[in-house]
Design a protein with these regions (language model features):
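Parallel beta-helix/beta-solenoid
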Residues: 97-121, 130-144, 166-178
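N-terminal extracellular ligand-recognition/capping segment immediately after the signal peptide
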Residues: 34-82, 89-92, 111-112
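Surface-exposed acidic, glycine/proline-enriched linker/cap segments
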Residues: 1, 76-96, 125-158
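Short glycine/acidic-rich loop motifs that flank beta-strands on beta-rich extracellular proteins
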Residues: 36, 47-50, 70-72, 92-93, ...
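Right-handed parallel beta-helix
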Residues: 63-64, 102-111, 169-179, 192-203, ...
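Beta-rich accessory regions
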Residues: 24-30, 34, 283, 301-316
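Single conserved hydrophobic/aromatic residue that forms the stacking wall/gate
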Residues: 1-9
């Protein structure tokens, strides 16, 4: 268990209020340098800012371990390359972030639980936020280089994802609980290969999808429970010019034995789908009558893209 957090925390935690961002980062770096292994978060409540992954690291949350993420936006600077509703940009760091990593995981019976006070205010999407979105739409539609799309400034209030893995390979998300999220809950963006299983997701804020796979391929999602404020499982493929530039469909996705307790849609496609979606198979999943739709494909005349080979079986 290279890079285990127990000893690091014993040296640095005081009164349960120490922000452990640096301690976690050091443990992940040590684990990566040693060739990989598990970074263990022990039982207890640990306050932290963003967690940035390196290859060959499993962040393991022991039972009754709670990672509590701060809600101070400055903790999530400097900005990192991410995406917002299908458009690439530099924004506040996601709470758990990986870029160009391989063989990474979050496992264990612990809980990810961000503090939500600031993000709840940002849910309201005031005029400066809407103006910032228009600015980002314009930059994306005119092919402004991504590094110039700096959105973590002023009152833009573009909320960070809870989990955002970007261009990663061999991903495992297993067993842990999620309790609330600033924006999309789990966003797997241009990732290749992975398993998402045994998750318990409860998040009822604005835009809180259960899981979003965007321009990703070769994933299995199984035995998860989704109780969220938007759609449960969402398959996306980028928006307009960015997606046409990246030219990467979302494909080869299996979803099985998952339950949705509350939310809008069991399986959604789009509306970011300009790169195309194909080969999605959902079976043996359940949703209550209160869910608006079992399946919903969303697009508009500007998106382009395609939807091919969608199967749903034994869904009720």
């Amino acid at each position: 268990e290279s890079g285990g957090l127990g000893d690091v925390y014993k040296r640095q935690v005081k009164g349960g209020e120490t922000v452990n961002t640096e301690a976690i980062a050091k443990a992940i770096a040590a684990c990566n340098k040693a060739g990989g292994g598990r970074v263990v978060v022990p039982e207890g409540e640990w306050l932290t800012g963003p967690v940035h992954f390196k290859s060959n690291v499993n962040l393991h949350l022991e039972e009754n371990a709670i990672l509590r993420f701060t809600d101070n936006p400055s903790d999530y600077l400097p900005a990192v390359m991410t995406s917002w509703e299908g458009m690439e940009c530099y924004n506040y760091s996601p709470l758990l972030y990986a870029m160009d990593c391989e063989n990474i995981a979050i496992t264990g019976k612990g809980t990810l639980a961000p503090i939500m006070d600031t993000w709840k205010i940002w849910f309201k999407r005031p005029k400066p936020h809407m103006d910032a979105l228009k600015e980002l739409y314009t930059m994306a539609s005119t092919d402004v280089p991504v590094e110039q799309r700096q959105m973590a400034k002023g009152e833009n209030h573009l909320r960070p994802h809870l989990i955002h893995f970007n261009r990663c390979k061999n991903v495992l998300l297993d067993e842990f609980k999620i309790r609330q999220s600033p924006f999309w809950t789990i966003h797997l963006y241009m990732c290749d290969g992975g398993i998402v299983r045994n998750l318990d997701v409860k998040a009822h804020g604005h835009n809180n999808d259960g899981i979003d796979l965007e321009m990703s391929r070769n994933f299995l999602i199984e035995n998860c429970v989704f109780d969220q404020g938007d759609d449960a499982v969402v398959i996306k493929a980028g928006r307009n010019q960015d997606a046409w530039r990246l030219n990467t469909p979302c494909e080869n996705i299996v979803i099985r034995h998952c339950d949705i307790l509350k939310g809008h849609t069991l399986l959604g496609i789009g509306s970011e789908m300009s790169g195309g979606v194909r080969n999605v198979y959902m079976h043996n999943c359940t949703a209550p009558d209160s869910v608006f739709r079992l399946f919903f494909a969303k697009t508009n005349h500007r998106r382009g893209g395609f939807i091919e080979n969608i199967w749903m079986k034994n869904v009720k």
